[in-house]
Amino acid sequence: IVEDDVAFGPENIGVPREEIGKRIDFALDAVGMQAFRHSTPSRLSGGQKQRIAIAGVLAIMPKIMILDESTAMLDPKGRREVMDVIKKLNKERGMTVILITHFMEEALEADRAIVMHRGEVVMDAAPEEVFSRSEELEAYNLTLPRAAYISKKLAEGGMPVKGAFNAEELAEEICASLQKI
């Protein structure tokens, strides 16, 4: 049962029984999974399972959460669900979240992006700054977010677009560029 999975961490660190129920409520509310409290985890989607896993960590009440490839092997909808929870925890609850990912669109949503290569930090800046250094990223076998890649290729082809990093920015840049023609 989902609530048993969420209770596992607090039980193992000795949280009193009466407090565990409150923490389960808090954690399931935080990840939007209260309606699945009595569900069988094996019947949940990949994104829902990841949200329950995050709830299990939240029930411990950490100040910092480290998530390693938390959206790997999820479909786009599941990936979006998990990223929405991560952003909510950071923005609304003030939790520090360290997200390790190979999905550049996810890295773009961070306050700070750190690129490591062979155990060394090679870039540490705002995501927009990191992604503006496309040649360096390519040297580390990292790709640009899709919109940034398209923006770069359009600029290389002569379309006057500034570096766009997401679909909305790219659409605005293309429209502005077309109005100049």
Please annotate each region the language model reported.
Residues 40-44, 48:
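Conserved ABC ATPase signature
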Residues 11, 18-36:
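Conserved ABC ATPase "signature" region
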Residues 137-181:
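ABC ATPase nucleotide-binding domains
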Residues 61:
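Conserved catalytic motifs of ABC-family nucleotide-binding domains
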Residues 76-78:
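Helix N-cap at the start of a conserved alpha-helix in ABC-type nucleotide-binding domains
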Residues 65-68:
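Catalytic Walker B motif of ABC-type/P-loop ATPase nucleotide-binding domains
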